[in-house]
Amino acid sequence: MDEEDPNLFTEFVDGLNGLLDDTFSKDDYVPIWKEITENVDKFNQPGIFTALIGYEWTPAPTGDNLHRVVVFKDDAKIAQKIIPFSAIDSNKPEDLWNFLKEYNSSTGGEAISISHNSNISGGRMFPLENSYGEPIDSAYANMRNRWEPLVEATQVKGDSETHPTLSPDDAFADYETWEGNIGRSQTKRLVRISNTGDCKDPLNYKCYKYKEEEEDRYIGSYVRSGLRRGLEIEKKIGTNPFKFGLIGSTDNHTALAASEEDNFFGKFLDSEPGPGRVDSCMAGCGRPVNMADGEDIPSGDLWRNWQITASGYAGVWARDNTREEIFDAFKRKETYATTGPRIAVRFFGSWEFTEKDSFDPNFVEVGYEKGVPMGSDLPLRETNKSPNFLIMAAKDPNGANLERVQVVKGWTNKDGSSSEKVYDVDLSSDAGSSTVNAETATYKNSIGESQFVSFWSDPDFNPREQSFYYVRVIEIPTPRWTTYDSVVFGNKLPKFIPRSHQERAYTSPIWYSPE
């Protein structure tokens, strides 16, 4: 076995995904699922601590991550009427969505899926084709929008908002960027060039021969490009398949929901705090590397622990702290993502807001009365005005100040392509400065602002262009978790590991469609 073969992980994952149904009996799952669901019910305290039943669907064909998280609105009694649909059953998202449809109709319950870790999907999370190699049509778009209303924009395996290759004019695009797919087996897009016999499954790499294409793999892997691709597809077929809201999540496999940079407990047990975790390999694979001597990642290894991200959390504007209300907020996409800080952010769109509304003490009530919240569509345009927006962002009470509030806009062009632009809506007077001391892993809240309340109107609005808008909130610079580790454990970090970063929040979009 060649330990430096970059395809080892691909073959390993394919082996897992290719397990025959009779390898494990469905009956084996019943007591496990019963124990899990009843344990969740045991700790669910409506109004105090809400625990949602869920599981992860985990296909990764050719090492491309297509994972989804399935979340239930229901209690154990209803959830136990089914056995979870797994990647052994199918690696096609359409089959998962059909399973969710059947669950809803047969049990009277309700469940949705949330796409997970798109940045390492090899361009497959927001594709141009369905799982059978056919162009996306309205049936696919409607099914996906119904059963998969949310996308995870940030987590421990990197940030999925955008990539500097996709957004070269965005100064904040290169944040916790991962390259390649989950197994680091591919850095270029692989395209089918021939069919081998009667095998027609485009998600099974054994069915096709591949070649590397010079085009990068990023389109279809990142949230912003997915939103833009959705507009482009809508212009062709009349339906947007990627009209999703945003959340963040940890993806930690330790049951420790600790994403603070100074209290980060890693992804797996082997990446919990300790002197050697920074230069060890994620999931315990590979060999020790003295990164202080300048060596990065050997070609046969997976991701190094220094690359994992202390992220993220899901913000949900629910009417009450209960399963039912949180789930309903998921469905209406009134959600946002943060990379770890508990930033609070509101985002409303309207044709009728005025700057005076941003000073109203009943800001939130005005937002709902005169406009629509994040995750919504602007109503039909009845005036010649540009859309205007109200934004409120407040710092984590125990965290760093805020440096700026931005609106990210995407729109379609006459030729069917799409464009994007990032607008600075509000800036602190000292934006661009830093107080980080990497030697002591400290910073000061002597710069930035504790809160921004903003009114913004689109200065470039074209009523003929489909568009989306979402808010990005940027903190002042703070130490990265690896810097805290360096100080606590006395590790010497190589130069290529960032000492500081700027954490952030992303809201779900608000969409505009021409009449």
Predicted regions and their residues:
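A metal-dependent hydrolase metal-coordination microenvironment
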Residues: 1-109, 113-129, 510
